[in-house]
Amino acid sequence: MLNKIYDWVDERLDITPMWRDIADHEVPEHVNPAHHFSAFVYCFGGLTFFVTVIQVLSGMFLTMYYVPDIKNAWESVYYLQNEVAFGQIVRGMHHWGASLVIVMMFLHTLRVFFQGAYKKPRELNWIVGVLIFFVMLGLGFTGYLLPWDMKALFATKVGLQIAEATPLIGTQVKTLLAGHPDIVGAQTLTRFFAIHVFFLPAALFGLMAAHFIMIRKQGISGPL
């Protein structure tokens, strides 16, 4: 049954060459841990992507119960944590995954830097990778406010004060994020939710697509 459906689609769209090109792509020997023990350092990028996928899936689950409103945000998180089946586990995965993905990205960045993989002709991919790092930090920052408890509120105020310290445009950046130059309230929560769920993920998907395309085009850099 499934084979017939696949054959029907393949006959019209010729999808076999596309997925075979991905599935049959040969992995260079120097990045295969089976041949070189030190090759495990090349796994940090893939592990970062794996944790990112977990973050996306767990985040989609959380948005089904979360209410981005100052009257209901904390209650919705409490309900998710204590009443929803597997809610505590999924939220824990998302919470710890947010820290783990930063750690993995940091290790991946160190590997690229110390092995000189950012040099010609991969300078543009290095820039894209740095942008991905900043987007990830932004996701962590905006997500921290969403439970709307005292710890999140005070941490967000500190973060907004840091943004306000930006030369020339600091006040505008703070107002853009908070929705008000002086008050951290309903508009702040709504904006952080929108940035966390829509704007930054859209930027992340676009940058990651560019990152992978350039890796496929240029190949994985060799060892020092």
UniProtKB/Swiss-Prot annotation:
Keywords: Cell membrane, Electron transport, Heme, Iron, Membrane, Metal-binding, Transmembrane, Transmembrane helix, Transport
Binding locations of heme b 2: R91, H94, H196
Family matches, as InterPro entries: Cyt_b/b6_N, Cytb/b6-like_sf, Di-haem_cyt_TM
GO cellular component terms, A-Z: membrane; plasma membrane
Any one GO molecular function term: electron transfer activity
Protein origin, superkingdom: Bacteria
Pfam families with a match to the protein in the record: Cytochrome_B
Principal localisation: membrane
Transmembrane domains' residue ranges: 37-57, 96-116, 126-146, 195-215
Quaternary structure and interacting proteins, as annotated: The main subunits of the menaquinol:cytochrome c complex are a Rieske-type iron-sulfur protein (QcrA), a cytochrome b (QcrB) and a cytochrome c (QcrC).
Record's protein name: Menaquinol:cytochrome c reductase cytochrome b subunit
Protein source organism: Bacillus subtilis (strain 168)
